[in-house]
């Protein structure tokens, strides 16, 4: 089990790399995360929903993503509550206290999934969540040491040296663990190191002498990896590699933004100057503004208005700019969004931005499906997925954005296009991941001679580079011996 001293220490990436190394060696390997809290998710082969990192790890392992890889997924709807997803299906919304009481039920789902994986695979790399040293979360823990103790799983602790304080993080985390939990930690991995590792050696010697546990590797900082992010927005809000005549793309960093992996292909595109715009920052000039998915559409609509984005969008459209709304962003572009059942917050109805003539009602049932099709205006093929709890109706849907294959072998429309051709809205995530669709959409937004980039191929190359790096910078013999 890979646990971290902090969030974003590198657990997800390390598990992905280890899965790829095991796959190369001919080992039947699977990733597993007992409990995940994330707004980036993926649709599985069995029609459920799991964290995006586990879907990436499944690619690394060479297996289909399915719900047993992440049996408990929490999707925050506010600072105090989250939608609880068990075995891929949304069960309920709970606040933090109520979920704490629900954990024994959730743990049963975790153990059931783990048992099925254990029966099917030779090796399972388990990813922890956050840090095991959160004293207030120790009772009924199902994500870190609570799980490791229950199934007798060895632990490797990873820490991010780029943030500073790595030795304090590692020794401090150990100090917060019980004796049995400390004994379960078999060694350390130091992640994101820059510089001459020989200068780090005195610290490594001290750490091993202090704890009696080996340092199993020092992994260098890998720039430019094209891998799906677990939850947080990328550290660099602007993609820096764009050409001088690049298309300017801007996305507001909504408080409840979901599936921002939709934009990874744009961030990697050499002809796109991509910006996330945080609260309080003035949006830069743009050719294309994209309203992203949201786990709280009403709250994020209020945020957009409070930040002046309604006026920004109005001015942008007046001068010929293009706008795309994806999932929750699509819903925001309509007349109104009704939440009669309190799916995302208090029941109620809010006025949308009003640029497309449709209205959305949030429902208790969630749509989860992988889709294929094409853009309605040209032959650009797409392959993506839907994750939403809304039903949208209105005249604007008569001019769809996409034409998708349905279950009967026919075609069904999705989304809407404005009459002037400046606005596209769709429920489909992963819109830019397919090379042909990405090139077509960038050309529609104003990019001359738009190139097609193969984002899945970039991701595959990054997984190979990651595995190559781990093969060099982890002491793999010592690693395998340490975890038994």
Swiss-Prot record:
UniProt keyword list: Cobalamin biosynthesis, Glutamine amidotransferase
Pathway membership: Cofactor biosynthesis; adenosylcobalamin biosynthesis
Transmembrane segments: none
Residues forming the catalytic site: 327, 429
Pfam families registered for this protein in UniProt: CbiA, GATase_3
Record domain GATase cobBQ-type: where: 246-437
GO MF terms, alphabetically ordered: ABC-type vitamin B12 transporter activity; catalytic activity
InterPro entries in UniProt: Class_I_gatase-like, CobQ/CobB/MinD/ParA_Nub-bd_dom, CobQ_GATase1, CobQ_N, CobQ_synth, GATase_3, P-loop_NTPase
GO BP of this protein: cobalamin biosynthetic process
PANTHER family with a match to the protein in the record: COBYRIC ACID SYNTHASE, DETHIOBIOTIN SYNTHETASE
NCBIfam families tied to this protein: cobQ, PRK00784.1
Entries under HAMAP family matching the protein: CobQ
Job description of the protein: Catalyzes amidations at positions B, D, E, and G on adenosylcobyrinic A,C-diamide. NH(2) groups are provided by glutamine, and one molecule of ATP is hydrogenolyzed for each amidation.
Family, per entry: Belongs to the CobB/CobQ family. CobQ subfamily.
Name the UniProt record assigns to this protein: Cobyric acid synthase
Species annotation: Paraburkholderia phymatum (strain DSM 17167 / CIP 108236 / LMG 21445 / STM815) (Burkholderia phymatum)
Name of the gene encoding the protein in the UniProt record: cobQ
């Amino acid at each position: 089990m890979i646990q971290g001293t902090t969030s974003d220490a590198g657990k997800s990436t390390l598990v992905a790399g280890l899965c790829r190394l095991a796959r190369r060696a001919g080992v039947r390997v699977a990733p597993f995360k007992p409990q995940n809290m994330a707004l980036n998710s993926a649709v599985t082969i069995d029609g459920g929903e799991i964290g995006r990192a586990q879907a990436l790890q499944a690619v690394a392992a060479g297996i289909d993503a399915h719900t047993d890889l992440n049996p408990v997924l929490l999707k925050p709807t506010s600072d105090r509550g989250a939608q609880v997803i068990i075995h891929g299906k949304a069960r309920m919304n709970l606040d933090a206290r109520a979920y704490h009481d629900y954990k024994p039920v959730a743990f049963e789902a975790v153990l059931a999934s783990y048992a099925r994986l254990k029966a099917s695979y030779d090796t399972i790399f388990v990813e922890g969540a956050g840090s095991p040293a959160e004293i207030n979360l120790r009772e009924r823990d199902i994500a870190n040491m609570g799980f490791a103790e229950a199934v007798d799983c060895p632990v490797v602790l990873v820490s991010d040296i780029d943030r500073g304080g790595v030795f304090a993080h590692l020794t401090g985390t150990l100090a917060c663990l019980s004796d049995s939990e400390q004994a379960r930690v078999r060694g350390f991995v130091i992640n994101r190191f820059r510089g001459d590792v020989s200068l780090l050696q005195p610290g490594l010697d001290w750490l091993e002498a202090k704890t009696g546990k080996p340092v199993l590797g020092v992994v260098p900082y890998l720039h430019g990896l094209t891998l799906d992010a677990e939850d947080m927005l990328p550290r660099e809000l602007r993609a820096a590699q764009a050409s001088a005549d690049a298309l300017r793309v801007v996305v507001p960093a909504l408080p409840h933004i979901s599936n921002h992996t939709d934009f990874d292909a744009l961030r990697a595109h050499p002809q796109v100057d991509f910006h996330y715009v945080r609260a309080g920052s003035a949006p830069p000039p743009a050719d294309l503004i994209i309203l992203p998915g949201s786990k709280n559409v009403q709250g994020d609509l209020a945020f957009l208005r409070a930040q002046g984005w309604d006026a920004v969008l109005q001015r942008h459209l007046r001068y010929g700019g293009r706008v795309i709304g994806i999932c929750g962003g699509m819903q925001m572009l309509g007349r109104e969004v009704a939440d009669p059942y309190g799916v995302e917050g208090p029941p109620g109805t809010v006025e949308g931005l009003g640029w497309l003539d449709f209205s959305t009602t949030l429902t208790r049932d969630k749509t989860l499906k992988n889709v294929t099709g094409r853009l309605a205006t040209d032959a650009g093929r797409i392959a993506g997925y839907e994750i939403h709890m809304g039903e949208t109706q209105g005249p604007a849907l008569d001019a769809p954005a996409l034409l998708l294959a349905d279950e009967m072998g026919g075609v069904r429309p999705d989304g809407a296009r404005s009459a002037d051709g400046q606005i596209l809205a769709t429920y489909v995530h992963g819109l830019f991941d397919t090379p042909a669709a990405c090139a077509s959409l960038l050309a529609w937004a104003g990019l001359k001679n738009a190139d097609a980039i193969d984002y899945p191929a970039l991701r595959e190359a990054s997984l190979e580079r990651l595995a190559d790096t781990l093969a060099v910078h982890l002491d793999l013999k010592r690693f395998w011996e340490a975890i038994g």
